[in-house]
UniProtKB/Swiss-Prot annotation:
Lineage, top ranks: Bacteria, Bacillati, Actinomycetota, Actinomycetes, Mycobacteriales
Name of the protein this chain belongs to: Glutamine--fructose-6-phosphate aminotransferase [isomerizing]
Domain of life: Bacteria
The species this protein was found in: Corynebacterium efficiens (strain DSM 44549 / YS-314 / AJ 12310 / JCM 11189 / NBRC 100395)
Swiss-Prot/TrEMBL catalytic activity: D-fructose 6-phosphate + L-glutamine = D-glucosamine 6-phosphate + L-glutamate
Domain spans labelled SIS: 295-435, 468-613
EC number: 2.6.1.16
Broad enzyme group: transferase
Transferase among keywords: yes
Main subcellular location of this protein, as a coarse class: cytoplasm
InterPro entries noted in UniProt: GATase_2_dom, GFAT, GFAT_N, GlmS/AgaS_SIS, GlmS/FrlB_SIS, Ntn_hydrolases_N, SIS_dom, SIS_dom_sf
Amino acid sequence: MCGIVGYIGQAGDTRNYYALDVVLEGLRRLEYRGYDSAGVAVYADGEISFRKKAGKVAALETEIARAPLPDSVLGIGHTRWATHGGPTDVNAHPHVVAGGRLAVVHNGIIENFSELRAELTAKGYNFVSSTDTEVAATLLAEIYKTEAEGDLTRAMQLTGQRLDGAFTLLAIHVDHPDRIVAARRNSPLVIGLGEGENFLGSDVSGFIDYTRSAVELSNDQVVTITADSYEITDFHGAPSEGKPFAVEWDAAAAEKGGFHSFMDKEIHDQPAAVRDTLLGRMDEDGKLMLDELRIDESILRSVDKIIVVACGTAAYAGQVARYAIEHWCRIPTEVELAHEFRYRDPIVNEKTLVVALSQSGETMDTLMAVRHAREQGAKVVAICNTVGSTLPREADACLYTYAGPEIAVASTKAFLAQITASYLLGLYLAQLRGNKFADEVRVILDSLREMPAKIQEVIDNEEQIKQLGRSMVDAKSVLFLGRHVGYPVALEGALKLKEIAYLHAEGFAAGELKHGPIALVEDGQPVFVIVPSPRGRDSLHAKVVSNIQEIRARGAVTIVIAEEGDTAVDEHANYIIRIPQAPTLMQPLLATVPLQIFACAVATEKGFDVDQPRNLAKSVTVE
């Protein structure tokens, strides 16, 4: 999500390119990350010149052709995915402040930007955009002037201490034409090392055409690069170190972060996708703040029914969310396939809240369902991953999932981000309606905040899961069983295997076994079972263990996904995939990940293109 590039070379060298060439090429390489505007800034002859434009890099290049920038050996560039403020020319980066003397680009979300903006406004600063980036740039300028005594590196260190959230910042200043200063926290930044030139990028794609020698920065570090050196410190000025590495991928592989496929990369992106979707949505006291939910509170309090409309994977995310929303809000909640919704004369009125889930925001079936719901007087909240798409424009409000672009057709990180955003919506409604006290909401939010690290634990165990997938490449059919929130996880696991491995797979509610599906179980039949926590509803856990015994007795190969410490499954499982302990409603964020890894491994072993499976499209824009 977003892309950053920085370049500094030596004046008077004999290279056949300038900073602008490097930065624009880097931005093109980073287009796969997704964005809605782009901009560049260069230093030459004592001045910073910049151009920025809503739209694609091509639109920026057209603007530069119309109004050329000077030749320069110092430049920074940015592709923006809108978070605070819409995708406009004004909100695009870079933000140039301090009378044109300082230019800043930024990736991430500054959680405390509202407080900082108020503080800076009180000091007489004016803002021309609605972005958190302009606030960070203005804060950097203020600290540079008042506390850092003209030391740009020190100013960046102090600024890093003041900012909450996730950010990568790059800055150039007319007082320091020989350097770029950058900082990072929970947002990627890599140094590229050349000969008489150095680079910065969100990832190595930004400079892979120029160097294969790189240094990865860690959290809460500041780096100052010149044409022939770099220096890393922490936010308090103490010397620090990065992690040098050699880039062995080509440019195409670099866009995938060195992974075999975009799907593999996006599975690994999931801790960040969940974390970024949570960012900026809680105040310092832990209270949930959904400023994007611009629907009158009295209307939300009067809601007496919620209908989730979606298709495919998004519909399964909605099914997970239903358990949480009904539990927290005590509002009857239905989940409808969007393409069925408007054809069955649904009961919808002004007290109905329709929640529409779509990664792309362009799913035609979902858009048609939304239009029908609004015609009946319902309010619509979109949960979407794509700023500027149709769905947010047609909804009454939108909660964006900050998962970043999802390139692979089969959804992975968008699914977890949709669950996360749906949970935030449910908690907000519970908080607003008084179903949950502030301390109860805070406990649940704390559990959500723990999920990125726990998802990473599951991913760290991927080799065991991949080996299992490779061993089952000749399976003719795979079944998936789950109860409660494990049921939609089973459905999603089956869908992934269908989508990318072209393998017959079915997901069932485990309680349905005796009502028909157990007839499918024969000797050697692989069956995944998602086991609920024994620390939750004991009866539910015991029933699933009983289901495992039933299918094992009929010759099934049982692959059990169970939390750490659950020994009740040990004697009944052929394979056990352990996930970290978590509250029942958080388990889908963990239990889904092994199923994604398994499907990807099976499809890869079969030699299929996991990113572009046959007959499928990423965005279904027809009914």
